[in-house]
């Protein structure tokens, strides 16, 4: 039998010249790209958070590289990052053999990178992509998704419940105090203010207890009820006020993550429409690179567009010339802002697709299909009756935006043979409300969306931000935040967005090198072919 030969294997061998750890990192490995890019970024804002003195600190650039590369490789846990610094050669090389523990990594991520400091890093990388011609920043494809908070789904506080319970408790306390005042024959017992406030109840409670202690009271049960008001009810009112202060304009929040709002998520395993604490994440993309991001508490998208566009301007100093978004952003207020600031809105509105259908276009009873005399301000119904301008109304949205609508009414529809097809109201004449300003914005948006460039943007939109969200959520497993508060979750989403951009950039560089190598090979083949001939 032939002897089997094995390669030399000795774990206890010493090397005369130990290899450099960089020798184990391939030249075209993504970790080298991350290292090269982050080496050229300005991190002075992060360095400003260090006070100096005391023991030596881990270098912020090293910690930044480790965390960014960890997110690029789908590692989101600080403990796992610390473990890889001892086990993985790429992390060892990137950290220069430094081994910060998970507390140092987590503290750097949640504190040093917060308050806009990481946004500065992200902005510099976007500028790099722009300088290389990968993005122009002239167009933004905008979309949003909801990401769950780390908070438990059963930690909710609802504004409606708080207000209702507070009102009930105020009335209950007022009743107890009135009974006590009557028992003590107080002169001002019937002269209480119409609006009951916690401060008034506090003063009345202290006064009643003081008088009871001074004069004595036969009804011990009443004395106990007033004491309970001071010990339990008034602190409970303070708790309700604290809830309302945290809620602000929101309808809900989570006790374990007060910045998170309860929202309906796309992933609903029980299929019962249950709300969960989360954040509405907004991104804008170009060529599938994320160029801007932000987090909002509003579950709907239309209220986030204006602050999101303003955040882009604050970072880059200008507005993009073209904005592309779906119908969730197509409100009158948003159109007005975009047109006023020189942006071209390729933004759908909620009736856009319905208006394109034959059934809609062939329906003469719809306001959009009726003849409108702009000079004399009246509509003409299918039977030829004039619908005159009879009133004006003003509505205020939850964002404080004021819309003006005009009411148009027919003179008499009681004997109209088309009434059953026209409307089903009980009144003898049809009325309709028209927002002319909103209609003009929608008409302009429709013309843009149906143009050649609009069709191009509409076909690109589903493969721009939606593809980024799908890649991040399903290919890289980021579906839930690990940190609490808007301040920290914004850093976390920024890291996810930067990792997404770097993955694309690494792939682009690899593809460019491959094409360059193929071109050089073709050039080298041509002289050889000529000499052979």
Role assignments for model-derived ranges:
Residues 3-6, 50-54, 453-456:
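A ubiquitous short alpha-helical element
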Residues 36-47, 72-75, 87-94:
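Short helix-loop boundary/capping segments at the starts of domains
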Residues 1-32:
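Hydrophobic alpha-helical membrane-insertion signals
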Residues 8, 67, 74-87, 98-533:
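Anion-binding and metal-coordination hotspots
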Residues 14, 27, 39, 59, ...:
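Generic alpha-helical segment signature
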Residues 25-68:
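Basic, short loop/linker segments at the boundary and entry of helix-turn-helix/winged-helix-like folds
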Residues 23, 55-59, 70, 74, ...:
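Short secondary-structure transition/capping motifs
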